[in-house]
Amino acid sequence: RIITLGLELGILQPGRIALAAPTGKAAVRLQEQIKDAFEQSPRSNSPNADDRPKAMTLHRLLGASADGSRFRHHADKLLPFDFLLIDEASMIDLLMMARLFAACGPETRVVLLGDPDQLTSVEAGSVLPDLCGGESASGKLAECRVHLNISRRAAEGTGILELAEHINTGQPQAALDWIQDPKNPHLHQVKGANVAP
């Protein structure tokens, strides 16, 4: 909704907005969400489907070479966008995040979406959790952080949200009680030689 509202108010300009995610699957999901947001927008001045921003992977956004060693956009050749919305930011490693910000102009607004408690990057660095800094965060970045309390992906009452809350807030006994409660989804303990310790 931030994009549709920004376009409606004239704060954002069509063609100057980029949407990206670390993986192709996340980019497809982001594109579907943007499509739904535009279709639900009550304003008649929303851009038509051809003018709407298209989601892509971070590698495509930055113009990565086939082997991923070179990028078309960098500090000397900036991205041509005023606004970047990056989904699943918890999956972005330190090197990719550095490349992303190096390719942004000084006036470019960047919105990072993600859950710092899940889907960490495979490569080095836990950038989103470090940027969020936990509950004790202070300073300019803390002033820009928004924490959503409602999950749009998991339905209320599915139970898994309750278990995640127990784990994320450091309540091991409550998590164990949830796991042992027969009304909750059944968990299977996996054993075998192919399972990492």
Located regions from the model:
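Conserved RecA-like ASCE P-loop NTPase motor core of nucleic-acid helicases/translocases
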Residues: 1-33, 113, 185-197
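Inter-Walker segment of RecA-like/P-loop motor cores
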Residues: 17-80
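Catalytic acidic motif of RecA-like/P-loop NTPases
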Residues: 59, 90-91, 98, 117-118
